[in-house]
Design a protein with these regions (language model features):
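Conserved alpha/beta-domain cores
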Residues: 1-147, 153-155, 167
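Short glycine-rich donor-binding/catalytic loop of glycosyltransferases
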Residues: 164, 171
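Active-site loop ensemble at the mouth of alpha/beta enzyme cores that anchors a bound cofactor
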Residues: 173-175
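Active-site-proximal glycine-rich helix-loop-beta segment
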Residues: 156-158, 163
Length: 175
């Protein structure tokens, strides 16, 4: 959130910003209306806060529901088993549009090791689509990063995160 708030005023206004990291509820007010898509909604409480802030600004906020497909304790995201229920609950919020799912697969040496996870989330996306839930559009399947994006695309990814491949390793130390 801080990075968006710092860089957005300095860069061209036609850039379409996405919120891709973990989002805390107390930071929601700073990004609603400033980003095209929030990739990391994994609780109803977070979605509810996004909806509250979106109503205040009279905007609709597109989101992706983050699924922890590999059940990794170190990562955020709802379990695949609970994802459909969460999608159904969030779908009732007036100022949110569920545009799809996002997952971050485990870091592996061999990208093939993540194929099963990518298949599982693709199937979850199909299952949600087949439920025909109002206000839910499974248009985006965001999965795959620099090391495994080719396998993710083969398994149905419509969006990949390849920043390291383009920009190199990030330095997260504050200067």
């Amino acid at each position: 959130v801080q990075e968006i708030l710092t860089k957005k005023p300095e860069l061209p206004q036609d850039i379409r910003w996405h919120m891709i990291g973990h989002l805390q509820r107390n930071k929601v007010k700073y990004i609603v209306g400033k980003v095209e898509l929030i990739h990391s909604v994994d609780t109803y409480r977070l979605a509810e806060e996004i909806n509250i802030q979106a109503k205040k600004q009279n905007v609709i906020v597109p989101i992706l529901v983050e699924v922890n497909i590999a059940h990794e304790e170190s990562k955020f995201g709802i379990s695949a088993e609970d994802a459909i229920l969460l999608v159904e609950e969030i779908s009732k919020l007036e100022n949110i549009r569920i545009k799809g799912l996002m997952t971050i697969a485990p870091y592996v040496e061999n990208p093939e090791d993540n194929r099963l996870y990518f298949r599982k989330i693709k199937q979850l996306s199909v299952d949600i689509t087949n439920k025909n839930i109002d206000n839910v559009f499974m248009e985006i399947l965001s999965m795959g990063m620099t090391g495994d994006y080719m396998v993710a695309i083969e398994e149905g990814a419509t969006m990949v995160r390849v920043g390291t491949g383009i920009f190199g390793e990030r330095n997260y130390k504050q200067e």
